[in-house]
Amino acid sequence: MAQPSTKVYDLIRSRIMSGTYAPGQHLVETEISQELNVSRSPVRMALKRLTQESLVTTESNRGSFVAQWTRSDINEVFDLRQMLESRAASLAAQSATPEEIARLQSLVDEMAELAQRRAEGYRDDLHHNNQAFHLLIVSAARSPRLFQFVRTLTDTSLTLGTYFYYSDADIDRSVHFHQDLANAIASRNPSAAEALMAAHLCLAHTAFETSRFGNDEQSA
């Protein structure tokens, strides 16, 4: 049975990802503990864990707040991901093992099923699937430093919450890109894999930014 702090963590994290808790929102321990009918201890532990994951920020004498991302932050993270992961996809097409290629296809199949069924909590499941897919490609590139750099970027709250801002059309397009990427790597086509990853992350960047900010230029 899951510990109270784990259940509280899962709930707060889900609310942050879905936007129920908005960026910059004050997360008051007493209010959350009363709502969830738990003591303040598991709430405090959950907020500490979320702070370590950069989903929450803690300010002295003020408390905990949902982490905020500016338009500039979004541009920086996606630009770096596009540069690094495009290179990783090219390398993966040259060095991925048959087992890794099979696993990539398995993740694509799972993603397609999740997107089709759209069961409760499917966006969170899509996030985990997506992260596993991208990190597997980077791992298959056989570059430990590249993997560490990308892992740092994909662990940000900005990247973790991407699927909660996607439209159904965005999700369907993402599934198709993942299939095309898996095919390019399986066929040992580095240039195609690199171009597909660049296009995939460029469109993901646009979809996320548009959904997150719309045309509000004041968020930069």
Located regions from the model:
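Short linear motifs at protein or domain termini
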Residues: 1-94, 210-220
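Electropositive phosphate-/nucleotide-binding environments in soluble metabolic enzymes
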Residues: 2, 6, 175, 191
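Conserved amphipathic alpha-helical segments that form helical-bundle/coiled-coil interaction surfaces
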Residues: 77, 87-89, 94, 98-162, ...
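Active-site loop of classical SDR/Rossmann-like NAD(P)-dependent oxidoreductases
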Residues: 170-171
